[in-house]
Amino acid sequence: MVSSIESSVGTERKLVTAIPGPKSVAMHERRKKSVSAGLTQGFPVYIERAEGAILQDIDGNRILDLGSGIAVTTIGHAVPELVAAVSEQVADFTHTCFMVTPYESYIEVCEELSNITPGTHAKTSALFNSGAEAVENAVKIARLATGRQAVIVFDHAYHGRTNLTMALTAKNMPYKDRFGPFAGEVYRMPMSYPFQDGLSGQEAAARAIKMIETQVGAGNVAALLIEPIQGEGGFIVPAPGFLPALSEWTTKNGVVFIADEIQSGFGRTGEWFAVDHEGVVPDMITTAKGLAGGMPLSGVTGRAELMNAVHEGGLGGTYGGNPVTCVAALAVIRVMRERNLIARARELGDAITGALKVLQQDVAIIGEVRGKGAMIAMELVMPGTKEANAAAAKSIVSYCNSQGVIALACGTYGNVIRLLPPLTITNEQLADGLSVLATAVRAAG
């Protein structure tokens, strides 16, 4: 293992070979012989080290990261405080299983989650390994606490790849195709999608509520599960008033409001959580991704009376809340505070949105620029329409890849380009990435 000084990869994007380079090509041949073909690969290189917003591949190319490992490395790569915390913990002990012999860092993470999640009510948390596991446990808790079974989800939603979370997820390919049968008592409602439906938040909420009450019945609903800003579904930001109206309805009807903040949480949108933008206080909130800076940790935080309704032994998992992941999460939270990264997310969002809106004036394929904080996207359309233009998105991602810039596509129809830079990216790095992206968009449009 090399030190952080020895492993410095520089701060500028730099290509020394074509993408992919010869070593990555050879590595990919090895991969095909031993790794399941069911795993995709968005960027065709193999990484050996990373620092800040730069990844270095095995050919020596420096790649600019505008994806953060899908909103995970929010504080950047190889942050010294995180590296030190993890290294020290590994030297002490790596695992005991919290359910067998517990440790303080698990409790500290739960205390921090109580502090930073919305609301001043009493809360408790349980820690797990992945976002899907957190969502699955949130639903499990809601069903037990309410004595009801039905779960409301929304069009374009993504909640994971386990059997239950596949049922909760909207898009078939690649997430669900031929993996059924899926868990039952899941009911899908229309999402507020201002660019496509033109409805106000109140109108969109009334539409969804009417369908719930007519097709499911409020008294049968255990939980309403929603991403405050949808992630894989296309960075869809609901119209103002949509989330508050749903929250009000759930409170009135004894339904547990679960905010899936796995992609949108931990400062990504310019607040600790996306629901904070409209003052929504969920009954439960799921976290993962940015929570632990790349370590596999997730959490469910909720009203104490809900979380504590579960019988002893009803929650858990061998690795959930592993001590190494817990100290990583504590380091992430410290760095977020000390470097004022939530404010930085707002600055980045202003810069990205401004640049993309200028580009939109000249390029007809950009239907909408949307998002909050450093969670910004472009929806690409056929010129003069709102019809999805997935071919343009594919072309843009391919060009960015060839230039050593990671840009990710998403959306139910594959026509959205999303930007999720580390919050520690420099202004110069961001400008460089946006310049490459602009060239790609102009070529595609």
List PLM regions with ranges.
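Conserved N-terminal phosphate-binding loop of PLP-dependent enzymes in the Aspartate aminotransferase
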Residues: 2-445
